[in-house]
Amino acid sequence: NRSDIPKPQSLPHDFHDYPSLAELMATASLTAPPEGVRSTGRLQRLVAPSLRQRHLMLPTAAMTLDPLHSTGIAHALAGVDRILNILMLTQSGTEQRQAVQQYETSFLQESKLLDELVSTAYLVMNDFERFTAACMIYFAGAIRCEERYQQGQNPTHLWNADDREFVQFSKQACFALR
């Protein structure tokens, strides 16, 4: 507890609206950074995951998305599985090129769907009913994808992003919720 580090004038959240949190934070001291609390704009980024035929990035290296729905672990593990399948293919150039293209297509479509769902949830966060509806769309896709795996299917996309009807429904629902 260093006394030379100034307490921030304001924290990222207005704890005055939450008396129990304000009470908990009343005795808190800043540990880092010494300059105080900082804020920034969106930290999201997206790049194509294929650098070369045998140089692929995991989804979590190619995309940074807000952790609202905790998608990172699932996306990373699916990426490991997909990349291993690509590496296990024989050295056939055509077969590998097709698999790499499928990897990139799946990744980009999943990322687009996730961005739509997460951004919609944030836009309507102040309206609990709309926020709940936005989150339900994400979980409907996640659960359906898990069910497909349990049924022995091997979806090419996570979050049901390979189901055109679901993706179209998601777009329409997000548009209506916004």
What positions do the PLM features span?
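C-terminal auxiliary extensions adjacent to catalytic cores
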Residues: M125-R178
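FAD-binding beta-loop-beta segment adjacent to the flavin cofactor pocket
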Residues: G36-L58, M63-T64
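Tryptophan-centric aromatic hotspots in well-structured domains and transmembrane helices
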Residues: N1, L43, H55, H69, ...
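A conserved FAD-binding loop/helix module that cradles the flavin
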Residues: L65-L84
